[in-house]
Curated annotation (Swiss-Prot):
This is Large ribosomal subunit protein uL6. GO terms for biological process: cytoplasmic translation. Part of the 50S ribosomal subunit. Belongs to the universal ribosomal protein uL6 family. This protein binds to the 23S rRNA, and is important in its secondary structure. It is located near the subunit interface in the base of the L7/L12 stalk, and near the tRNA binding site of the peptidyltransferase center. The keyword Ribonucleoprotein applies. It comes from the Bacteria. Gene3D superfamilies: Ribosomal protein L6, alpha-beta domain (3.90.930.12). One of its GO terms (molecular function) is rRNA binding. Keywords: Ribonucleoprotein, Ribosomal protein, RNA-binding, rRNA-binding. Pfam families: Ribosomal_L6. Transmembrane segments: none annotated. Disulfide bonds: none annotated.
Length: 178
């Protein structure tokens, strides 16, 4: 029995939901999110509330029950508030700037790194903080992870790109012989 799947999802004002075959479509104006129910989760639309239940008693259906509910909830939050991740750049000469739809990073390599910003994502840079915003939680996390992967923080001085709330475990350097 899924504890997450049992909980209903409230639709905020301005959102509309509809079913097309095995797909749940949540819409706000021109922006829409499509969630595939894989045919094993039944979605009930009652006014401004979505409820979910498995169609069959298989292990896969029970697993997808909570997953589909969580994806629908993330779609509602994404369309109303949006998601954001903040990254911090630490290091001498490390910097970032946005040029059109390209994020240009200088991270101590012999060349700048040009990262193309995907559709649906906005990136802003203030001093050494990169903010990644969007309505799709998975895409925001993926883009932030890709930016971090260009120069992960190293454990000795903490130089690199890290999440703002991430704690880097520091190591002591080598000690000199007597």
């Amino acid at each position: 029995m899924s504890r997450i799947g049992k909980q209903p999802v409230k639709l905020a004002s301005g959102l509309e939901a509809k079913l097309e075959g095995n797909k749940l479509i949540i819409k706000k104006g021109q922006d829409e999110k499509v969630i595939d129910t894989k045919g094993v989760v039944k979605v009930n639309i009652n006014g401004d509330e979505l409820t979910f239940e498995p169609v069959e008693e298989t292990k896969f259906a029970k697993a997808m029950w909570g997953t589909v509910r969580a994806l629908a909830n993330n779609a509602v939050i994404g369309l109303t508030q949006g998601f954001e991740k903040k990254l911090e750049i630490n290091g001498v000469g490390y910097r970032a700037q946005v040029k059109g739809n390209i994020l240009e990073l200088q991270l101590g390599y012999s060349h700048p790194i040009n990262f193309e910003i995907p559709k649906g994502i906005t990136i802003t840079v203030e001093k050494n903080i990169i903010t990644v915003k969007g309505s799709d939680k998975q895409q925001v996390g993926q883009v932030a992870s890709e930016i971090r992967s260009f120069r992960k923080p190293e454990p000795y001085k903490g130089k690199g790109v890290k999440y703002v709330d991430e704690h880097i475990i520091r190591k002591a350097g080598k000690t000199a012989k007597k």
